[in-house]
């Protein structure tokens, strides 16, 4: 079957307090280049943030409870940006907004060029910004040559 997923169309996050989450996400998503919409769905308020490729939406949770990244479900959400400089700039601007973003750095335990910052939303959902990694570029450029995905770039002799 020749079907290929070309991206993630949308991601919905249930939040415990929609107003509090809007106060957090409005400036964060604006900083990341997203635009806001507020179309309700089935009579319930929803907030949608769009960029060229993806929709990120907030909806009120139906049951109380704190986010637990180690229970079944979403562990964290990572947004990719163009460069380490972009990560540095975004982390600095997030901190200026009052967001507790960790100092960006390399995380070689993930990949040799994994440069990121981390922060959390009001419900404890861990968010991340990572610089475009060489492996992602190589996978995209050499997709047709790659057949194994345990260290695909190394196995194909591209690094």
Regions found by a protein language model. Give the residues of each.
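N-terminal beta-strand motif that seeds the catalytic metal site of vicinal oxygen chelate
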Residues: 1-22, 77, 133-159
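Glycine-rich acetyl-CoA-binding "A-motif" of GNAT/NAT acetyltransferases
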Residues: 126
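Long, continuous compositionally biased terminal/linker segments
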Residues: 2, 51-82, 88-89
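Vicinal oxygen chelate
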Residues: 15-20, 78-123
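Short beta->alpha transition motifs characteristic of CBS
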Residues: 112, 118, 129-136
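Residues that flank catalytic or metal-binding motifs in active/ligand-binding sites
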Residues: 7, 45, 52-54, 73-75, ...
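Core segments of cupin and vicinal oxygen chelate
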Residues: 12-57
């Amino acid at each position: 079957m020749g079907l290929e997923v070309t991206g993630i169309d949308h991601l919905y996050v249930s939040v415990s307090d929609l107003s509090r989450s809007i106060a957090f996400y409005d400036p964060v998503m604006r900083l990341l280049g997203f635009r806001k919409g507020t179309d309700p769905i089935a009579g319930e308020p929803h907030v949608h943030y769009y960029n060229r490729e993806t929709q990120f939406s907030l909806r009120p949770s139906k049951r109380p409870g704190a986010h637990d990244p180690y229970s079944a479900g979403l562990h964290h959400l990572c947004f990719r940006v163009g460069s380490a400089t972009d990560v540095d700039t975004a982390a600095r601007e997030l901190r200026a907004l009052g967001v507790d973003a960790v100092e960006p750095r390399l995380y070689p335990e993930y990949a040799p060029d994994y440069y990121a910052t981390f922060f959390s939303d009001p419900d404890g959902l861990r968010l991340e910004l990572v610089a475009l990694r060489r492996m992602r570029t190589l996978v995209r450029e050499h997709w047709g040559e790659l057949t194994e995905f345990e260290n695909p770039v190394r196995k194909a002799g591209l690094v």
